[in-house]
């Protein structure tokens, strides 16, 4: 086009201009096109998250992001989390998930054969290891999912028309699911939500109250419930028994429960941590009876320390169609591949490795049981001391005159308030003990739980934690040592609680706060003058006083810990006093709190009123100074106020009057004249500031004795001679101080005209003078012969 343009236009200058214009227009168009494309990309990528924009990220950046998400930011405070011990068996289990994703890419025929082999092998191995003959297996991620599928299977088995008529069949004859009162929390609600059943279909079977363990299902009461449901036209469908309850690891009487279920045609399902002991050579009869049940749920992941391993539900049923409808079996290869991590891990561990891990956990629990039996003030809640793999213990304190056998449950004749107070005190202390042990021995895997009857307890379940955390026998010994080291603190604190309550209630201005969740000596609140006792709202003035009180108490550097927080039932601030590790003088502690809080309140009132006092004083001073200035004008006259004339008059006749000043005394809150300051060249006030209020009792402490400690006169920590020496020094100090006070009093009472005694006299003269004063007789001069 450029050549044709040059041919048509003969003028070279005009042709050059056309060429340049064309290039310029092309540049502008290209620039506009690029701008529109970039704007279009921005609009398109504005809704796309940052990590997805662009052409993607490399693997290193992605793994770095995952690491940051796992471990958190560096600025965050590190939390004490349990680190799972992932060994080679753990890597094998994790490899199973990646290998399963790779296997799923095979062709259908190879995938079907491989998944069938993996599923059949794993099912056979688990049935042989845990003595469950001729069983089928269902692998699931959620532990409760297997039980929900079993309930569906039981419904299909008992209601033949359920597939056709659906829930209309259930409406005519409602099914009943029986769960123990010691079952895991939320299990019944989960089953009803999964099955679409109303909550009245659940029946909670109570535990024993008179004979046997209080965490075992009451079989006689169960039979009564079943008979009542049958009479009401209901269908007893399924019973969930425990081989190791979720709380304390107790096992139900599975043998008797199996007989009851066979009698009434009820499906028996067993779950619990004690099922792991079926792999051992010796198994208790109560757990061995679980092999005759209709189904059971196993959790080999925690038992063997295998991460990301599914739970397994073993069951016995002959109709494959019903199991398929219930969801226990599936034709999808992906569902069968759930068993791959467990299939790899079981082969890696072998039978010896599996038995060794379960046996090691049981030995740890037995070791802890035997050690805690020798520790005083520790009660062990164990069903069977020979085979129980779960240890539950709690701290207790025997009441004076009580039966040692009734450690956890107070006597029925005791008052309800005393029983509740004792229960809450022990619960708070056990909660503190459990948290301390978890921090000191993190490899133990302890958990703190609240039981309905026993209260707060500490649970050691090595079957669920030992393989994961790598717990050893040395960790158990360290745990026992930590328990023994905390017992003096617990016993001392519990003994001082009642004394602290009595002292606080007897002290004016202090209010004892009953907080059942506080494990320390107690909680106290100072009631200031403007405190509204009926209000539960936040009190700013009280919060300020308690904040100052907390600061003063912490400055004493005692062995006690003090904290400030809201009251248990309101938002008012309180002082929380922590655990006592030694014998504490409660009366001195309470008195110190009361006196210090009163001083802080008075100081705060003084500061609040200071602004108003100073303002009024300044106004009064201004008025007085203005009056003084007017009086000066009247005395000097008007002529002296004229600049030139006043200077001449002042030179011939100087003014003798002095300037009257005023000073404001903050201590007295009054105006005073400055004449005393300028005439006598002395600054000061005749008003003596008030003394700082102190406690009514002043306690002499021995050297090195911390605040709030009782007297060490009877202590074995100090030698007899040293303690006697310290006591004599204290008595001498008291006598000397008392003698000085007496001499000062006598000197003030003496007549002002009486001559002062000489500076130095012989001892005899002093004695004669003292005798003369005592007899109140005139002194007669001795003859020279007697001198």
Curated annotation (Swiss-Prot):
What keywords are assigned to this protein? Answer: Decarboxylase, Lyase, Phosphoprotein, Pyridoxal phosphate
MF terms from GO for this chain are: carboxy-lyase activity; pyridoxal phosphate binding
Q: Tell me its EC number(s), please.
A: 4.1.1.-
Q: Which EC class heads this enzyme's classification?
A: lyase
Positions bearing Phosphothreonine: 688, 692
Presence of keyword Cytoplasm: no
One family from Pfam that matches here is PDXDC1-like_cen2
The keyword rRNA processing is annotated on this UniProt entry: no
**Bias type Basic and acidic residues, positions:** 29-41, 774-787
> Which BP terms from GO are recorded?
carboxylic acid metabolic process
Query: Can you cite an annotated GO cellular component?
Result: intracellular membrane-bounded organelle
Q: Which residues are recorded with the post-translational modification Phosphoserine?
A: 653, 711, 719, 723, 747, 785
Annotated region Disordered: the residues are: 29-52, 683-787
What cofactor does this one take?
pyridoxal 5'-phosphate
Q: Where is the composition biased (Polar residues)?
A: 685-697, 735-745
Per the record, the similarity remark reads:
Belongs to the group II decarboxylase family.
Protein's UniProt name: Pyridoxal-dependent decarboxylase domain-containing protein 1
Q: Which organism is it from?
A: Bos taurus (Bovine)
Q: What is the lineage of its organism?
A: Eukaryota, Metazoa, Chordata, Craniata, Vertebrata
User: Which gene carries the instructions for this protein?
Assistant: PDXDC1
């Amino acid at each position: 086009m450029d050549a044709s343009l040059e041919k048509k236009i003969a003028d070279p200058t005009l042709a050059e201009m056309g060429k340049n214009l064309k290039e310029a227009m092309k540049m502008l168009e290209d620039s506009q096109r690029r701008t529109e494309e970039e704007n279009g990309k921005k609009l398109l990528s504005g809704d796309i998250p940052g990590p997805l924009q662009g052409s993607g990220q490399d693997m290193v950046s992605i793994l770095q992001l995952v690491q940051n998400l796992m471990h958190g930011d560096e600025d965050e405070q590190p939390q004490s989390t349990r680190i799972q011990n992932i060994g080679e068996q753990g890597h094998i289990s994790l490899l199973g998930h990646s290998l399963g994703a790779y296997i799923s890419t095979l062709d259908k025929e190879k995938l079907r054969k491989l998944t069938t082999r993996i599923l059949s092998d794993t099912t056979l191995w688990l049935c042989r290891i845990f003595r469950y003959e001729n069983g089928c297996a269902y692998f699931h991620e959620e532990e409760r999912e297997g039980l929900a599928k079993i309930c569906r299977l039981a419904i299909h088995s008992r209601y033949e028309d359920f597939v056709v008529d659906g829930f209309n069949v259930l409406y005519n004859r409602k099914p009943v699911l029986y769960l123990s009162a010691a079952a895991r929390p939320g299990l019944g609600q989960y089953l009803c939500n999964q099955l679409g059943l109303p909550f009245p279909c659940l029946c909670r079977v109570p535990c024993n109250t008179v004979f046997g363990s209080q965490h075992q299902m009451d079989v006689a009461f169960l039979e009564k419930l079943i008979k009542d449901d049958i009479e009401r036209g209901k269908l007893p469908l399924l019973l969930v028994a425990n081989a190791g309850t979720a709380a304390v690891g107790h096992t139900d009487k599975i043998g008797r429960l199996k007989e009851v279920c066979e009698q009434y045609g009820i499906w028996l399902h067993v779950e619990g941590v004690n099922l792991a002991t079926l792999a051992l050579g010796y198994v208790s009869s109560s757990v061995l009876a679980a092999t005759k049940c209709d189904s059971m749920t196993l959790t080999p992941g925690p038992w063997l320390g295998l991460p990301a391993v599914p739970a397994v539900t073993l069951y016995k049923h002959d109709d494959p169609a019903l199991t398929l409808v219930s969801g226990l079996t599936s034709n999808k290869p992906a569902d069968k591949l759930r068993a791959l991590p467990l299939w790899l891990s079981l082969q890696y561990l072998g039978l010896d490795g599996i038995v060794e891990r379960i046996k090691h956990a049981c030995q740890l629990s037995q070791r802890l049981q035997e050690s805690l039996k020798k520790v005083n003030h520790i009660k062990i809640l164990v069903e069977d001391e020979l085979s129980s793999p779960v240890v539950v213990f709690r701290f207790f304190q025997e009441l004076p005159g009580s039966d040692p056998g009734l450690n956890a449950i107070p006597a029925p004749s005791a008052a309800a308030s005393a029983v509740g107070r004792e229960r809450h005190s022990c619960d708070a202390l056990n909660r503190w003990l459990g948290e301390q042990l978890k921090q000191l021995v993190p490899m133990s895997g302890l958990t703190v739980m609240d039981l309905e009857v026993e209260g707060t307890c500490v649970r050691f379940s090595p079957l669920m934690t030992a393989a994961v955390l790598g717990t050893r026998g040395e960790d158990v010994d360290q745990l026992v040592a930590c328990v023994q080291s905390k017992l003096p603190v617990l016993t001392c604190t519990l003994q001082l609680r009642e004394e602290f309550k009595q002292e606080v209630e007897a002290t004016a201005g202090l209010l004892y706060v009953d907080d059942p969740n506080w494990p320390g000596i107690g909680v106290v609140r100072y009631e200031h003058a403007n405190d509204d006792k009926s209000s539960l709202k936040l009190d700013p003035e009280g919060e300020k006083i308690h904040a100052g009180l907390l600061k003063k108490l912490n400055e004493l550097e005692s062995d006690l810990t003090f904290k400030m927080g809201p009251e248990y039932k309101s938002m008012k601030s309180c002082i929380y006093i922590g655990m006592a590790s030694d014998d504490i003088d409660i009366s001195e502690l309470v008195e110190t709190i009361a006196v210090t809080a009163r001083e802080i309140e008075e100081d705060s009132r003084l500061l609040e009123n200071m602004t108003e006092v100073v303002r009024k004083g300044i106004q009064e001073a201004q008025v007085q100074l203005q009056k003084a200035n007017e009086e000066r004008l009247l005395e000097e006259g008007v002529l002296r106020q004229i600049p030139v004339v006043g200077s001449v008059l002042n030179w011939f006749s100087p003014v003798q009057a002095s300037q009257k000043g005023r000073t404001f005394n903050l201590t007295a809150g009054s105006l005073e004249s400055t004449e005393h300051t300028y005439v006598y060249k002395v600054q000061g006030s005749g008003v003596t500031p008030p003394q700082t209020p102190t406690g009514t009792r002043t306690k002499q402490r021995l050297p090195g004795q911390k605040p709030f400690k009782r007297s060490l006169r009877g202590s074995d920590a100090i030698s007899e001679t040293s303690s006697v020496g310290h006591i004599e020094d204290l008595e001498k100090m008291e006598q000397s101080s008392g003698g000085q006070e007496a001499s000062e009093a006598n000197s003030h009472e003496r007549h002002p005209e009486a001559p002062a005694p000489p500076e130095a006299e012989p001892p005899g003269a002093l004695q004669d003078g003292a005798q003369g004063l005592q007899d109140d007789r005139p002194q007669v001069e001795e003859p020279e012969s007697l001198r």
